[in-house]
């Protein structure tokens, strides 16, 4: 993942929270049960947490309230600025992304929501391999993102978006790197993790991977 998405993130920063509240009809189903999704990620995390894609700080805030020690990584300057307004003054957010980041001294859980699809499948594998080296046995990766059970599920979702006139959503699904569960299962298992997938809305699944 390079910097190709940073412009998009900067543009989206000031409207992101309205998206997650379901104000955009095309993305309403993508963000259905948003608060529950964040809570699920928090509940599956423990200890020192490395968060990729802090965004406007919604997950970060819940992690901090739950007593986690959080190290936040976010590539977008605009997102970092908005998040800092919402989070405790002493909390710092470091510039970086899934593949290029400052490594904290201690990591128990790596988390992210609505962001891992910015990496190609090859980049996802590189990232998970890197995280495997950083986590001790029992350490966890907890990612919530749009993924699909198989190719047929993906094809049907794209076609349904087009039929409903949701052309922005359809384009998004076809241009970013929304992967399939078998691909992610192979990536995690090949890098020493046991992984489970839990569906929380039509689009979003929570991937909980534990280092073996």
UniProtKB/Swiss-Prot annotation:
- For this UniProt record, give its keywords in alphabetical order, as a comma-separated list: Methyltransferase, S-adenosyl-L-methionine, Transferase
Q: Does the keyword Methyltransferase apply?
A: yes
Select a single GO molecular function from the record's annotations and give it: S-adenosylmethionine-dependent methyltransferase activity
Presence of keyword Acyltransferase: no
**Which residues are S-adenosyl-L-methionine-binding?**
53, 74, 97
Q: Which residues form a coiled coil?
A: none
Question: Enzyme group, top EC level?
Answer: transferase
Q: Which Pfam families match?
A: Methyltransf_25
Enzyme Commission number(s) of this protein: 2.1.1.-
Q: Which domain of life is it from?
A: Bacteria
- Gene Ontology biological process: methylation
What is the protein's known function?
Answer: Could be a S-adenosyl-L-methionine-dependent methyltransferase.
Family, as annotated: Belongs to the methyltransferase superfamily. YrrT family.
This protein is called what?
Uncharacterized methyltransferase BALH_3960
Q: Which organism is it from?
A: Bacillus thuringiensis (strain Al Hakam)
Lineage, uppermost ranks: Bacteria, Bacillati, Bacillota, Bacilli, Bacillales
